[in-house]
């Protein structure tokens, strides 16, 4: 228990130091794990990567926007530390540091505007112009009295099976989230992704409805086709219910043998993202509708991120 408390304290202080001293940093908790991880670098070491470029054999942390070409793709070329290994002295941490200010002017949609956008997409689906589109909405709130670190740990406690993350890119902003969807995971033997779709209250006893099963099958078929179009044969696992806080989703694991994908990680990621779970289907048509209907830029919301 003492070790866990120490790691939480150290990581909270490190997050505060990143914000106060305005240097790039990230923190995360892997799905189903208890430990926390951290990494940081000097601003001039933060790498901006061109589209299609991916550091396959370099340790660090990757942070990409929802739509390629719209915003920079960042890579933190650092050794990832466990939270209990953090040195606050090395981060020039001082308690009560003043946070660096970043002025953000979001464009919020009223509920009426959002409802109109939903109806526009539903009409397009009714005309069979697209099969699925995922709409997002921005809501600006007063900053909570809790710190970034406190919010990060609350998310980790609430969503134990999610990838929980916090990222600070000076001049760009801070991003915090908890996602149940793994875009790509490599264990040295296989590459694994998941088809995640269909939502209901967690713990429901009745069988999944036809609508949710069809929605999930769209994602499974999409990912399988992406792999086969690249000449890769997917291994499709058994469908199961995956809990995410107060809800659960249908999930099908899909994997590849690592050898068949050597040197093609950037190509595979680019083809997979955005999946129907965050964008829609067919991919390009759904993206066109999202650009047309939404009144804001998603920026890094719905993008992908994670350790290398």
Language-model-derived ranges and their functions:
Residues 32-34, 40-143, 147, 230-232:
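Non-catalytic accessory segments adjacent to catalytic cores
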Residues 20-33, 39, 142-218:
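An anion-binding catalytic pocket shared by soluble metabolic enzymes
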Residues 62, 128, 184, 286, ...:
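A residue-level signal for conserved active-site and pocket-lining positions in enzyme catalytic cores
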Residues 115, 123-131, 157-160, 169-172, ...:
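Secondary-structure boundary elements
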Residues 82-112, 118-119, 142, 194-291:
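Contiguous alpha-helical scaffold segments within structured protein domains
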Residues 169-173, 239-247, 304-308:
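A glycine-rich phosphate-binding loop feature that marks nucleotide/adenosyl-phosphate handling sites
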Residues 283-284, 289-308:
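Glycine-rich, small/acidic residue-mixed loop/short-helix segments
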Residues 1-48:
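Short, Gly/Pro- and small/polar-rich lid/capping loops
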């Amino acid at each position: 228990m003492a070790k866990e408390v120490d790691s939480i304290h150290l990581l909270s202080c490190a997050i505060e130091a990143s914000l106060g001293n305005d240097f790039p940093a990230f923190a995360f908790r892997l799905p189903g794990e208890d430990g926390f991880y951290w990494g940081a670098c000097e601003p001039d070491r933060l790498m901006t990567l061109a589209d299609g470029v991916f550091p396959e054999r370099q340790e660090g942390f990757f942070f990409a926007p929802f739509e390629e070409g719209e915003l920079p793709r960042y890579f933190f070329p650092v050794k990832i530390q466990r939270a209990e290994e953090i040195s606050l002295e090395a981060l020039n941490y001082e308690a009560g540091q003043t946070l660096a200010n970043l002025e953000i002017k979001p464009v919020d949609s009223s509920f009426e505007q959002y409802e109109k956008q939903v109806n526009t997409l539903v009409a397009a689906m009714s005309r069979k112009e697209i099969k699925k589109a995922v709409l997002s909405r921005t809501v600006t709130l007063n900053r909570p009295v809790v710190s970034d670190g406190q919010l990060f740990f609350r998310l980790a406690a609430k969503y134990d099976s999610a990838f929980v993350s916090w990222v600070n890119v000076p001049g760009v902003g801070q991003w915090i989230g908890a996602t149940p969807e793994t875009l790509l995971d490599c264990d040295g033997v296989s590459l694994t992704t998941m088809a995640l779709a269909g939502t209901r209250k967690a713990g429901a006893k009745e069988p999944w409805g036809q609508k949710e099963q069809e929605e999930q099958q769209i994602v499974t078929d999409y990912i399988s086709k992406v792999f086969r179009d690249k000449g890769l044969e997917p291994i499709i696992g058994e469908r199961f219910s995956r809990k995410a806080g107060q809800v659960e989703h249908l999930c099908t694991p899909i994997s590849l043998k690592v050898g068949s994908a050597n040197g093609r990680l950037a190509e595979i990621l680019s083809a997979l993202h955005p999946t129907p779970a965050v964008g829609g289907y067919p991919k390009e048509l759904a993206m066109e509708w999202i650009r047309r209907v939404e009144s804001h830029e998603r920026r890094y919301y719905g993008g992908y991120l994670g350790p290398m």
